[in-house]
């Protein structure tokens, strides 16, 4: 029996590949799709992810979705692409404030220190994912 699955992650090869989570988050959706399930993945749209290289496209129904975070009204939007060499769809959650300034280390600054706002960044991401 086919299931509809929404898979949320912070890394997927080749878009964001920092830890062992990236290959895992690439393999699991691919395997589930090969088993006949309808799977969609969602990932933060980090500033270093090239829209041109990965052919990210606007998703009209995922534009400007309002949600509340820490008592503030926020707006979430997402773009879409596919994991290369698969038909697994990936939604990229956009936020200029939370994801745009990150370098390709994701969780750390260039000097190796863990970013102090990681907990808030991924709390925002989790809330936005549940709202889309």
For the regions a language model picked out, list residue spans one by one.
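A short, glycine/small-residue-rich beta-strand->loop->alpha-helix junction that serves as a flexible
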Residues: 11-24, 50-52
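A short, Lys/Arg-enriched amphipathic alpha-helix followed by its capping loop at the start of a domain
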Residues: 27-37
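Nucleotide-activated donor-dependent transferases that construct or modify glycoconjugates
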Residues: 1-18, 43-45
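Hydrophobic anchor at the start of a short beta-strand
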Residues: 37-39, 90
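Short, highly selective alpha-helical patches that border small-molecule cofactor pockets
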Residues: 21-25, 29, 126
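A conserved catalytic-core segment of Leloir-type glycosyltransferases
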Residues: 45-132
